C-alpha cells in the first residue's frame, strides 16, 4: 500500500471518527516514524490509524500550528460556536473553592480552618442550594488561546486532568468575551497529556502563580494524572425547592416564618458598620407536615452582621459591648466627668479604698458596659457595709469600701454613697496603671449632712472637644444613671438591671431605652397574630422579650389575616415582600423607649409600645440627674 493512500485514509479516519484535523506534513512524518519503529513490518490500516491518534494525544498542539477555531472568536463580545473542535487543555482550576486552601491541600499542610465553609455549617438548611463546582479551563487549538467555563457541571472533567489533555467541543456552544460556556452535552474527553507541560502547568504552580507566591521548582505530577481517560466524578447537585406559587399555596394559619439570624451577633445600634447586607436572614416558611421551604427566592436582611464570621449563639458576654465606637465613649466620659464634679465627698470617719486590678488596654468604659452592682447601706448615719462593684469583664475587679468606724458628726446622705458607687463603676480613665486611687484615712473624713467636705474622690480629667447638643443628648440618655435613686417608674425610663434586681412579684410595666441585640426566635403567625422573640439591652443588662402583634403589624404594614389575603393573589405578592423588607429596615437601627410588661410568673417580658425620645424626656432626665 503506497504512503499517499495510507495518509489519505488516516486523515479521513481521524476526521470522521474523532473530528481531529492535523496538517498533512505532520501526518506523513508521523506515519513514516511509526513504520520505522515497527521495523518496516506490514501494519494494517487500522493499526496505523490508531497509533497516529495516540501520537496526536501526546503532542502539544502548538507544535502543529494548525488553527481549528474560527478567526475573530476572541474579538467578538459574544457569539455561538457550532460544529466539532478538538482542543487541548493547558490547565484548569476549580474557581468555586479558595485557591489558598487548594494549594495547602496539595502541599500536604493542615487545612482544617479552610475546610470550615458554608457547606459545613450547621445553620445551612437542607433546601438551600449547595456550592457547585466550577472549573475554568485554559484551552488552545495551537494558535488561539481561549478559556472554557464549566457553565453547568460536566462529569467527565475533574481537577486532576493532566496538562495537555485533549477534548472535543461540539454542538452549539455560546461564548462571551473569549470564554466558552461549556455544558455536559458539549464536551467529550479524548484523553492524552503532554510531558513538556506537566511541570509548567502543574496544579501547584498554577495556584502559586494565581496567589502571587513563589513557585515550587520541585513540584511533581499530581496524583491522578496517570489516568489518561478519567472516569466520571461525583458532581455537587443542587436541591431545588418548589416554586413561589407552590410555596404560597401551602401556607396555612399556623405557618412559621423563620428569620435565620443565627450568624448575626451585632445590631445596628451604636455601630458604624456599613455592611448592612452582610447578614442573610432568609425568610422561610414551615409546613405542618414537612420541613421548611423558602417563602421567597430573595432573602430578607434583618440585622447587620459583624465584619467577622461568628458562630451562632444567643449567649453574650460583656466583651461584646466593648466594640462600640470610641466617639460614643468620649461623649459618655464627658457626662461621667460632670457627675464626678457634682459628687460630694464620702463623709465618714474611716478610709475609702479603691483598688483596681490590672485592666486590659482594650477595655473602654462605654454605654454598653454591663456591670453588676451589689450594695448594702443604711439610711442613717450607721456604719456602711462594703460596697462591691463587679463586672463579668475578665481581668477587671474593683472594690469600693468605706471603713467600719462610727460617725462623729452627723449622718451620711444616701445619695452621696450612691453617687460615689456610680462614679466608682466608671472611674476607669487610665487603663495602663496597675494600681491607683489609694486614699489614706486622712484623705476622707466624716462631716455633717449640712457641712459636707469639699474634697472629692481623686480622678483624672477627661478632655473632649465634642460639643454637639444632639450627641450630648444621646450620651445622657445612654448613661446608666444612679440605680440607688431610681425606681421602676422613674421618668423618663428605668434600667433592665434594676428590674432584674428588684424581682417584682406582680406583673409590672416598665419603660426602658433599649436596642435589639439579636433575634432569638422565629417570626411566627399563629392564631391571627404576629410574634417574634428577641434579646434587648439598654447597656445595663440583657432581657429576653416578645414583641406584641400591634408593633409587628405596624412595622410590617399588614396583619396576619391581611397576609393570607395577599398570598392568594399573585399580583399582591410584591406587597408581601415590601412589607417584610420594611420591617427589616426599621429593625436594623431600632433604639427607642420600650414599654415592657414583665411577668414574673412566666419569666416572660413583652414589648407593648415603642416610643421615640424627645426633648421632654431629656428634660426629665436632667431633672433626675440634678436631684
Swiss-Prot record:
SMART domains: DUF1767. Residues 374-387 have a biased composition (Basic and acidic residues). GO terms for cellular component: nuclear body; RecQ family helicase-topoisomerase III complex. Residues 399-411 have a biased composition (Low complexity). GO terms for molecular function: nucleotide binding. It holds the Pfam family RMI1_C. Residues 362-412, 432-472 are annotated as: Disordered. Transmembrane segments: none annotated. The keyword Nucleus applies. Keywords: DNA replication, Nucleus. Residues 363-373 have a biased composition (Polar residues). GO terms for biological process: DNA replication; double-strand break repair via homologous recombination; resolution of meiotic recombination intermediates. It is found in: Nucleus. Belongs to the RMI1 family. Essential component of the RMI complex, a complex that plays an important role in the processing of homologous recombination intermediates to limit DNA crossover formation in cells. Promotes TOP3A binding to double Holliday junctions (DHJ) and hence stimulates TOP3A-mediated dissolution. Required for BLM phosphorylation during mitosis. Within the BLM complex, required for BLM and TOP3A stability. Component of the RMI complex, containing at least TOP3A, RMI1 and RMI2. This is RecQ-mediated genome instability protein 1. The gene is RMI1.
Amino acid at each position: 500500500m503506497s504512503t499517499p493512500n495510507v495518509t489519505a485514509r488516516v486523515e479521513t479516519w481521524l476526521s470522521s471518527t474523532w473530528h481531529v484535523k492535523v496538517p498533512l506534513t505532520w501526518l506523513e512524518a508521523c506515519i513514516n516514524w511509526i513504520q520505522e519503529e515497527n521495523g518496516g513490518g506490514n501494519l494494517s490500516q487500522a493499526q496505523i490509524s490508531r497509533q497516529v491518534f495516540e501520537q496526536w494525544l501526546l503532542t502539544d498542539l502548538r507544535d502543529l500550528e494548525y488553527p481549528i477555531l474560527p478567526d475573530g472568536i476572541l474579538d467578538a463580545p459574544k457569539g455561538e460556536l457550532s460544529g466539532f473542535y478538538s482542543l487541548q487543555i493547558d490547565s484548569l482550576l476549580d474557581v468555586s473553592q479558595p485557591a489558598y486552601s487548594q494549594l495547602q491541600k496539595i502541599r500536604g499542610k493542615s487545612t482544617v480552618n479552610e475546610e470550615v465553609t458554608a457547606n459545613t455549617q450547621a445553620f445551612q438548611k437542607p433546601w438551600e442550594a449547595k456550592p457547585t463546582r466550577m472549573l475554568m479551563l485554559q484551552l488552545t487549538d495551537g494558535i488561539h488561546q481561549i478559556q472554557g467555563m464549566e457553565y453547568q457541571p460536566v462529569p467527565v472533567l475533574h481537577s486532576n486532568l493532566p496538562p495537555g489533555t485533549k477534548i472535543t467541543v461540539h454542538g452549539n456552544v455560546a461564548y462571551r468575551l473569549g470564554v466558552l460556556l461549556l455544558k455536559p452535552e458539549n464536551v467529550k474527553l479524548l484523553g492524552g497529556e503532554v510531558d513538556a507541560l506537566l511541570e509548567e502547568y502543574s496544579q501547584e504552580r498554577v495556584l502559586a502563580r494565581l496567589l502571587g507566591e513563589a513557585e515550587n521548582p520541585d513540584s511533581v505530577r499530581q496524583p491522578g494524572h496517570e489516568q489518561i481517560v478519567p472516569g466520571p466524578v461525583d458532581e455537587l447537585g443542587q436541591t431545588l425547592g418548589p416554586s413561589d406559587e407552590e410555596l404560597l399555596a401551602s401556607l396555612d394559619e399556623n405557618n412559621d416564618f423563620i428569620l435565620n439570624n443565627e450568624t448575626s451577633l451585632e445590631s445596628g445600634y451604636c455601630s458604624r458598620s456599613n455592611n448592612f447586607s452582610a447578614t442573610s436572614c432568609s425568610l422561610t416558611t414551615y409546613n405542618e407536615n414537612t420541613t421548611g421551604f423558602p417563602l421567597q427566592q430573595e432573602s430578607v436582611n434583618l440585622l447587620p452582621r459583624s465584619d467577622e464570621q461568628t458562630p451562632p449563639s444567643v449567649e453574650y458576654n460583656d466583651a461584646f459591648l466593648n466594640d462600640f465606637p470610641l466617639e460614643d465613649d468620649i461623649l459618655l466620659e464627658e457626662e461621667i466627668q460632670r457627675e464626678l464634679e457634682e459628687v460630694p465627698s464620702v463623709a465618714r470617719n474611716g478610709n475609702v479604698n479603691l483598688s483596681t486590678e490590672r485592666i486590659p488596654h482594650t477595655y473602654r468604659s462605654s454605654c454598653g458596659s454591663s456591670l453588676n452592682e451589689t450594695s448594702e447601706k443604711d439610711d442613717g448615719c450607721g456604719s456602711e457595709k462594703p460596697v462591691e462593684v463587679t463586672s463579668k469583664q475578665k481581668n477587671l475587679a474593683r472594690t469600693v469600701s468605706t471603713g467600719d468606724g462610727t460617725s462623729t458628726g452627723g449622718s451620711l446622705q444616701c445619695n452621696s454613697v450612691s453617687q460615689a458607687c456610680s462614679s466608682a463603676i466608671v472611674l476607669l480613665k487610665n487603663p495602663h496603671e496597675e494600681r491607683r486611687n489609694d486614699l489614706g484615712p486622712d484623705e476622707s473624713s466624716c462631716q455633717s449632712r449640712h457641712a459636707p467636705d469639699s474634697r472629692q474622690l481623686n480622678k483624672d480629667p477627661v478632655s473632649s472637644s465634642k460639643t454637639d447638643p444632639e450627641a450630648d443628648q444621646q450620651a445622657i440618655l445612654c448613661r446608666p444613671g444612679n440605680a440607688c435613686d431610681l425606681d421602676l417608674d422613674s421618668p423618663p425610663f428605668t434600667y433592665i438591671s434594676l428590674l432584674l434586681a428588684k424581682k417584682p412579684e406582680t406583673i409590672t410595666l416598665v419603660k426602658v431605652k433599649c436596642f435589639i441585640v439579636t433575634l432569638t426566635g422565629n417570626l411566627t403567625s399563629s392564631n391571627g397574630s404576629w410574634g417574634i422573640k428577641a434579646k434587648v439591652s439598654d447597656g445595663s443588662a440583657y432581657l429576653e422579650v416578645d414583641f406584641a402583634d400591634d408593633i409587628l403589624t405596624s412595622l410590617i404594614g399588614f396583619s396576619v389575616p391581611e397576609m393570607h389575603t395577599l398570598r392568594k393573589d399573585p399580583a399582591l405578592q410584591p406587597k408581601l415582600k415590601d412589607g417584610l423588607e420594611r420591617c427589616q429596615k426599621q429593625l436594623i437601627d431600632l433604639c427607642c423607649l420600650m414599654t415592657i410588661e414583665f411577668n414574673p410568673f412566666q419569666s416572660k417580658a413583652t414589648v407593648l409600645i415603642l416610643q421615640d425620645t424627645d426633648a421632654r424626656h431629656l428634660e426629665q432626665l436632667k431633672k433626675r440627674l440634678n436631684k
